[in-house]
Each structure stands twice: as structure tokens, then as C-alpha cells.
Regions:
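Positively charged
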Residues: 1-161
Length: 161
């Protein structure tokens, strides 16, 4: 199934991996393929019908080839853990991020229709909140920067009465 999609999109198989991982395993993913940086960022949108009391969460996964950060705004302090790190660290991430890419695909996963719609999209792309944090985190991987933050063990317990 994926092989046909890759052929229709006219992209190398390796480049499709972050999108596939995000679709199958969830989360954001990045990969360096030869001279190409590839990143998948997942956005969740919940739709709920108040009258019928039923809804679904649409997942939009964006695949970016050679993404570039155009702008970042704000600072959010948050806990993150990545790969070979033993525990989470306190890191700074932008609240808003604008990026562009040489090539971008948007995959929309709808659990109600059981369809994955794919289309080529043009930037720039604006993300805020957790999606902006994901962009920042994955760009660190692509730029081969090690995530650095304050160790979690510097937290202190506080009992409120």
C-alpha cells in the first residue's frame, strides 16, 4: 500500500519514513537521508457534535523535506525526554514557529472514514503550542544538536496543605 503512495508522490522511499512512523506509531519524527532533512509533525484536531454527543480526532501529519525555521516567538519551559536520555529535562521551546520547506505533504487521518488523504501543500507553515515544540525538537535532531536542558532531578517536592 505505501509503495504505491510513494510512487505517486514521486519521493524516495527513505523520505517517506517519518510520515509513515508518525501515522503508525504517533508523535513527531525526523530523519537525515543523505543530503535531505526530513521531518514529520503531527497536529490533532478534535471535532465533536454536541447534539449527537459523538466526535473524532482528526490527525494532520505534515511531512517536510529540508525544513527551515523562518521565525520563532515566545518561550515555553517544558519537560521533554528524548531517545538515549535517561530522564526528562527542562527545556526552552518557542510558543510559535513558522517554517518552510522545499517540499511538503499533508496527510489527514480520519478515524471515522478510515481514510488517509494526502496532498502536496505550500508554505510557509505556522505552528503554535505543542506543534511548535515538536518542530523545535525535531529541528534539533536534524541540525545534529543535542537536546540540552536542566536535569529533572533538580525539582523539589512540595506538599501543599
Amino acid at each position: 500500500m505505501e509503495k504505491e503512495v510513494i510512487e505517486k508522490l514521486k519521493i524516495p522511499q527513505d523520505v517517506f519514513l517519518p510520515l509513515l512512523f508518525s501515522i503508525k506509531f504517533g508523535g513527531d519524527w525526523s530523519l537525515k537521508v543523505k543530503s535531505t532533512n526530513v521531518m514529520a509533525i503531527k497536529e490533532k484536531i478534535t471535532r465533536f457534535d454536541e447534539e449527537k454527543m459523538v466526535g473524532y480526532t482528526l490527525e494532520n501529519v505534515f511531512l517536510f523535506l529540508n525544513p527551515v525555521i523562518l521565525n520563532q516567538e515566545g518561550i515555553i519551559y517544558r519537560l521533554e525526554k528524548c531517545g538515549n536520555k535517561k530522564e526528562r529535562e527542562i527545556v526552552k521551546r518557542p510558543y510559535k514557529t513558522t517554517i518552510d520547506a522545499e517540499y511538503a505533504i499533508k496527510a489527514s487521518l480520519n478515524p471515522m472514514t478510515k481514510k488517509i488523504s494526502l496532498k502536496k501543500v505550500e508554505g510557509p507553515f505556522k505552528f503554535k503550542g505543542s506543534n511548535a515544540y515538536g518542530v523545535s525538537h525535531e529541528m534539533e535532531h536534524l541540525l545534529e544538536d543535542e537536546m540540552s536542558g536542566e536535569p529533572f532531578f533538580e525539582f523539589e517536592y512540595e506538599i501543599e496543605e
